[in-house]
Every structure is written in structure tokens, then in C-alpha cells.
């Protein structure tokens, strides 16, 4: 019989896209003074927010997954398992797998964690994180067309 799987909770970061008043672009009054959140910033916010929301200690996490589509092209960072581990010192040396499946990357990461729990893992952490505003519309469209 398969083990039952429970989702304890999660966290959603604030969306700051190109139409958001806090999005920094060349005509924004803070242009040159501050920058938009990076992919790594969102990973840290997602992980720490989920741990706080669920009351789970990072040390209790046995395995983790991160879903992302072409982080290496939008953010020059493809090795996102290390970025997730960097979100909390108690995640150091935990196995983390990046899952990529275009628009389904986060969902596939979640499905992978569910299967791991059914196989015996007690506590898994999943993050789905994207930053796709680092390129021009033309470059971004070209990258997204690769899906």
C-alpha cells in the first residue's frame, strides 16, 4: 500500500513583473540605485517562507527539488540545487534535484517529491522559481520558444 502524502503548506513570493510599480527599469526613479530581485533572492524567499509557513525545521528536510525553466539563460545560473541549499545552512549536504519541464517544471518537481515520500522519504521540500524579466522581449521570446 502506498504511503499517504500530506502537503503542510507553502509560500508565494510577490510577483514583480514589468508592469509592477516596484519593477526597476530605465525610467524608474530608482534605476541605478537598486535592482530587481534575482533568481537566488526568490529561491531564498520561497524556501524560508515555506519553512516558516509550515513550522518545519530545515534540518528535518531529507530531500529537496527545485523546478525551473532555463535559469541558465535568464539568470546565468543552471545549478539551482546549490542555490536552494544556500537558502538555509541546515540544508547543506541534503540531496537536491533540479527538474525542468518547460511550464510544468514546478509541477514535475512536486510530483517527484510525492513519489519520494511514497517510497519512504518523510520530509521533502519543493520550490518552483522563475525570473524571466532579465532579457528584452525579443530575447525572452526566443528563449521561451525553446520550450
Task: Name each model-derived stretch.
Residues 1-96, 118, 128-147:
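Conserved "HGTGT" condensation-loop signature of ketosynthase/thiolase-family condensing enzymes
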Residues 97-130:
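Active-site-proximal alpha-helical scaffold in enzymes
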Amino acid at each position: 500500500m502506498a504511503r499517504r502524502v500530506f502537503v503542510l503548506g507553502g509560500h508565494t513570493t510577490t510577483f514583480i513583473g514589468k508592469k509592477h510599480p516596484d519593477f526597476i527599469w530605465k525610467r524608474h526613479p530608482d534605476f541605478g540605485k537598486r535592482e530587481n530581485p534575482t533568481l537566488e533572492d526568490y529561491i531564498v524567499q520561497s524556501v524560508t517562507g515555506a519553512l516558516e509557513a509550515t513550522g518545519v525545521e530545515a534540518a528535518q528536510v531529507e530531500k529537496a527539488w527545485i523546478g525551473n525553466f532555463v535559469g541558465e539563460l535568464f539568470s546565468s545560473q543552471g545549478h539551482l540545487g546549490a542555490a536552494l541549499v544556500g537558502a538555509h545552512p541546515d540544508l547543506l549536504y541534503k540531496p537536491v534535484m533540479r527538474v525542468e519541464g518547460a511550464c510544468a517544471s514546478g509541477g514535475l518537481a512536486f510530483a517527484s517529491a510525492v513519489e519520494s515520500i511514497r517510497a519512504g522519504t518523510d520530509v521533502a521540500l519543493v520550490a518552483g522559481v522563475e525570473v524571466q524579466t532579465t532579457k528584452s522581449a525579443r530575447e525572452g521570446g526566443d528563449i521561451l520558444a525553446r520550450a
